[in-house]
Amino acid sequence: MGAVVVDDGPSGVKAPDGGWGWAVLFGCFIITGFSYAFPKAVSVFFKELIREFGVGYSDTAWISSILLAMLYGTGPLCSVCVNRFGCRPVMLVGGLFASMGMVIASFCTSIVQIYLTAGVITGLGLALNFQPSLIMLNRYFDKRRPLANGLSAAGSPVFLCALSPLGQILQHEYGWRGGFLILGGMLLNCCVCGALMRPLEPPKKSEATKEPAEKKAKKKLLDFSVFKDGGFVIYTLAASIMVLGLFVPPVFVVSYAKDLGYQDTKAAFLLTILGFIDIFARPICGMVAGLKWVRPRCVYLFSFAMIFNGFTDLMGSMSVDYGGLVVFCIFFGISYGMVGALQFEVLMAIVGTQKFSSAIGLVLLAEAMAVLIGPPSAGKLLDLTRRYMFVFIIAGIEVTTSALVLALGNFFCIKKKPAEPHTKEAAAEREELNKSEDKTPEDAKVDSIEVEQFLKDEPEKNGEVVTNPETCV
């Protein structure tokens, strides 16, 4: 993954913060929607799958877990593929895989076959779209990055609002097999989003400043030096604990309502409520995170969001009727939206732009292990106790614990770096150096925060969107 994975573009390109970036944001919005909403939306088919194959709650919960585990666990593989082939080809192939998995799943005759098709193949396809789209988004936006991350993250609740009732309708009209087939066709839209991912290139420079071919060949595919950063280690640990319980309530809330005796359509409407609230929570939280006095303390806002989410799970465990579940979904949608809007923004703030692609792949890999444990364990607990209260309590404790690990770890273990003075003399001197120097030192090592500040202050033109035959299809 090296310094910058995306399309192997030269470092030091100033983010356009607009232009074609809005098209990239739209593509990322759709990809995020499919990637995160799909594992939850397929839960509306669980009752039918239980009746069809004679399995338990824990068995069907594995479908969502495998989807999420593939989305997270293949992070390093996705980074290497992007580094080798570019974002656009990887996303096009990923869209085909995602569609093919659901189409084949519609012909399956056992739950294990569904694990391999709807779980592994579709999950791999979504992963090959999700990570490249995030990397491209964070290269196109800098000053507006919190807002861009919030808007793209809103794709998850928007698609959840649409896919959950749509899945219920498809199941009623065509059965779960017909529903899987139609959803597989919809996933081909990932290929369209992949076509929007055009690489950035900096303004043309003289031959003396061009990076030698030998140096390009030596770039690392995966940079493990991020583990030397204490902030990254704390974030990875906290995120891994968080995902143990974060995805459990959305997976089981529909079944919870059905077991209370409510109709399938009414039960599925709970996910629509959750998603509708989530739609507004994510961009609003992104705007708040972009405020001058909030952005330097974004990690603590993220910790608050996780505590809020965990507390909501604990309160939701006391729900005994449909009204209680509606209230739970409203507050869960707010807290879940805050977590979704901030998780990658905080990671970027911790490791910096240059190491983001390495960091996100390794974080997703660590989270994959937790995802494989969370929902299946909750399903097994439900099979043993037949009480959803315990499932929600365990999920709430896990998410709250992760918030405490992140907040306390950063407060006590991470030393704050003194703010760099921005005097007029220093700014004038830096501008003079930028104008006079013809060559950038090859092995300059700087802090990630300094890199981002330099890119913001540098009076260089924004990078232009180009079509590079080596990185585009």
Curated annotation (Swiss-Prot):
- Taken from the record's topology, the Extracellular segments are 39-61, 113-115, 171-179, 253-268, 319-321, 380-388
What GO molecular functions are on record for this protein?
lactate:proton symporter activity; pyruvate transmembrane transporter activity
Kindly list the residue ranges recorded as spanning the membrane.
18-38, 62-82, 92-112, 116-136, 150-170, 180-200, 232-252, 269-289, 298-318, 322-342, 359-379, 389-409
Basolateral sorting signal: where is this region? 427-449, 449-473
- Residue ranges for the region (Disordered) are 421-447
List localization entries: Cell membrane; Basolateral cell membrane
Report the membrane topology from the UniProt record: Multi-pass membrane protein
Q: What is its main location?
A: membrane
* GO CC field: apical plasma membrane; basolateral plasma membrane; lateral plasma membrane; nuclear membrane; plasma membrane
What's its catalytic activity?
A: (S)-lactate(in) + H(+)(in) = (S)-lactate(out) + H(+)(out); pyruvate(out) + H(+)(out) = pyruvate(in) + H(+)(in)
Q: Which residues lie on this side of the membrane: Cytoplasmic?
A: 1-17, 83-91, 137-149, 201-231, 290-297, 343-358, 410-473
> Which GO BP terms, alphabetically?
lactate transmembrane transport; pyruvate catabolic process; pyruvate transmembrane transport
Q: Which UniProt keywords apply?
A: Cell membrane, Membrane, Symport, Transmembrane, Transmembrane helix, Transport
| SUPFAM superfamilies for the chain | MFS general substrate transporter
User: Domain comment, in the record's words?
Assistant: Two basolateral sorting signals (BSS) in its C-terminal cytoplasmic tail are required to direct SLC16A3 to the basolateral membrane.
Matches recorded under NCBIfam families? 2A0113
> Subunit arrangement?
Interacts with BSG; interaction mediates SLC16A3 targeting to the plasma membrane.
Question: Which family, according to UniProt?
Answer: Belongs to the major facilitator superfamily. Monocarboxylate porter (TC 2.A.1.13) family.
The record's function comment reads:
Proton-dependent transporter of monocarboxylates such as L-lactate and pyruvate. Plays a predominant role in the L-lactate efflux from highly glycolytic cells.
Name of this chain's protein: Monocarboxylate transporter 4
State the organism of origin. Answer: Gallus gallus (Chicken)
* Gene this chain is encoded by: SLC16A3
